[in-house]
Structure formats: structure tokens, C-alpha cells
């Protein structure tokens, strides 16, 4: 049994809280759509919706379904996704990294500090899970080494990915640093099975950078 992480393979607890709520709408059909994107050029997904639109709950559901730390079949066997042809193929087959960017932004004094803290926290959990394979503090090198040694791909879930553009709306240099990090982390990386990002702002270009030019 894997030890659950805060960011790496966080398990099913957050999603189970949603399931136990008085009002729960089964949106597991989303999983069939994301399953179809895995291993394709469309594996990078960005969902822009207003607050309170259920974006975080959807990310919790995806983390529970894809994450390999907990057998979540007992949960999903009861949901609509269980009838999909791809259901068993991807259930609990991936290492999941789930991040809420707002959490890191709120306790950071700059973009540089935020990105350093994010890497430190995630890589620390990667080292605990894969002590024999992670030799670097750089998140890209760490994940690439894990993939090279184990063949295991990652599903990366990022909530509030666009919070930087609200906080640093007039700081183009900060925006550029952030987008450069996202791109270097995710673009053309063999370890990425699926990247699913949620935000509030509409997708657009910031300066000369395309926010989702993956």
C-alpha cells in the first residue's frame, strides 16, 4: 500500500467527501472523455469556468480515478463511468500530481519563490515514493527519471492555473516566468499521460506567449 501524499497520489478522501454530500451529481462521464485523450496530441486540457462551477470536484474525481495509491474501484463501480469501455483500462494506472496554484501563490512573495516552493514540495514527495530514482531537485528531471526507470506515466491536475494572471496582471515578466515553467514541465514530455488544468479566465495570449501553446 502506498503512503498517500499531499500532491503525489492524494487518494480518494476529497472526492469521497463530495460523494457523501446531500447533493451530488454524477459527472463521471468526464472520465470517458479524458481517457480518450490519453496518449494523443490532445492530452493537454484546460477548463475555464466561473467559480463554484464544480471544477475542483472534477479534479478530485480524476485524481481518485487515475491515482495508483488506492484501489478506487469500489467507488467508481457505482458511477456512470463504470459502463464505459475504457473504464478498467485506466483505473488506478497512473501516478497523479494534483496542485492548486492558488495555495502556493498565497504564501509566496514572488513568482520565483512560488515556483521554487512548488518544486521543492512535489519533488520531496517524489523522492519519498521513488528514493532509488530521484537524484535531482528539479521537477522535470525527477519525473523524467522516474518514467525512464519505471515506465510509469503521470496524470497532472492543476487547479487555479491562471491565478498568477489575476495577481500579477500588470507584471509581464512574472507571467513569462510562470508560462515558461509550465511549458518546460509539460510540453513534449514523455512522462505526461494527461494534463488537466482548471481556471477562471478565458484562454488568451499574454504578451508574446500563448498560455496553452503545448
Predicted regions and their residues:
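Phosphate-binding site recognition
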Residues: 1-214
Amino acid at each position: 500500500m502506498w503512503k498517500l501524499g499531499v500532491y503525489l497520489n492524494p487518494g480518494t478522501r476529497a472526492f469521497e467527501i463530495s460523494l457523501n454530500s446531500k447533493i451530488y451529481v454524477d459527472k463521471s462521464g468526464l472520465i470517458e472523455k479524458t481517457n480518450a485523450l490519453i496518449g494523443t496530441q490532445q492530452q493537454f486540457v484546460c477548463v475555464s469556468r466561473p467559480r463554484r462551477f464544480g471544477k475542483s470536484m472534477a479534479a478530485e474525481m480524476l485524481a481518485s480515478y487515475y491515482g495508483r495509491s488506492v484501489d478506487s474501484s469500489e467507488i467508481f463501480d457505482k458511477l456512470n463511468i463504470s459502463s464505459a469501455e475504457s473504464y478498467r483500462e485506466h483505473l488506478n494506472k497512473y501516478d497523479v500530481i494534483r496542485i492548486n496554484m492558488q495555495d502556493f501563490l498565497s504564501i509566496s512573495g514572488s513568482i520565483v519563490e512560488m515556483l521554487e516552493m512548488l518544486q521543492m514540495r512535489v519533488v520531496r514527495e517524489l523522492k519519498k515514493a521513488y528514493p532509488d530514482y530521484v537524484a535531482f531537485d528539479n521537477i522535470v528531471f525527477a519525473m523524467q527519471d522516474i518514467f525512464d526507470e519505471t515506465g510509469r506515466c503521470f496524470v497532472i491536475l492543476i487547479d487555479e492555473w491562471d491565478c498568477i494572471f489575476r495577481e500579477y496582471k500588470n507584471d509581464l515578466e512574472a507571467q513569462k516566468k510562470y508560462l515558461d515553467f509550465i511549458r518546460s514541465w509539460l510540453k513534449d514530455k514523455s512522462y505526461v499521460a494527461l494534463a488537466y488544468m482548471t481556471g477562471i479566465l478565458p484562454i488568451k495570449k499574454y504578451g508574446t506567449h500563448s498560455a496553452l501553446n503545448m
